[in-house]
Amino acid sequence: GMIQSRERAKALIMAGVVFVNEQKVDKAGEMIKEDAKVEVRGHDIGYVSRGGLKLEKAMQCFPLTPNGKVCMDIGASTGGFTDCMLQNGAVKVYAVDVGYGQLAWSLRTDERVVNMERTNIRNVTLDMLAEPIEFFSVDVSFISLHHIFPVAQAITTPDAMGAVSYTHL
């Protein structure tokens, strides 16, 4: 297809750059005819998912950088934050998620990424990592930050920095 993954296609639709027969598409599940004219207009989001845009914005607004650092993406899913970290100089990213089979293929095959799928962050310890984390991101919705921060403190360096995107359901 035109787009490398469903998540990427959904991200482009939500970004408002997908048009079908000259009409902007705003629903990812919308059915279209096989002979429809599909176009992607404007700029690609640049990451495997919209999550990368969230972290990019945080790095523009706050003095945060993964450059030259060992990082962790907590709640990695498709890997938008992971992708953003790598594109901004991360030397390694531990991509942690309780789900599996979600991380984009380009990240799964990147030697700088340690795919920790089927892993609950509450169970991660420093001895599971080759080195402590210097930069981390959190993008979760089904676990309280109350459970995440003690783990983050235990696996990070004293001067580690992070960005948190949280949706309380």
Regions found by a protein language model. Give the residues of each.
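A basic, amphipathic helix-loop patch mediating RNA/tRNA/ribosome contacts
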Residues: 1-36
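Conserved class I S-adenosyl-L-methionine
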Residues: 69-75
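Conserved SAM-binding loop of SAM-dependent methyltransferases across substrates and taxa
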Residues: 80-88
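Short beta-strand element of Class I
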Residues: 91-94
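S-adenosyl-L-methionine
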Residues: 100-130
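A short, conserved alpha-helix within the catalytic core of class I
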Residues: 143-151
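A short glycine-rich, Lys/Arg-flanked "PGG" loop and its adjoining helix->strand segment in the class I
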Residues: 150-159
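Conserved small/polar residues in nucleotide/adenosyl-binding loops
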Residues: 167-168
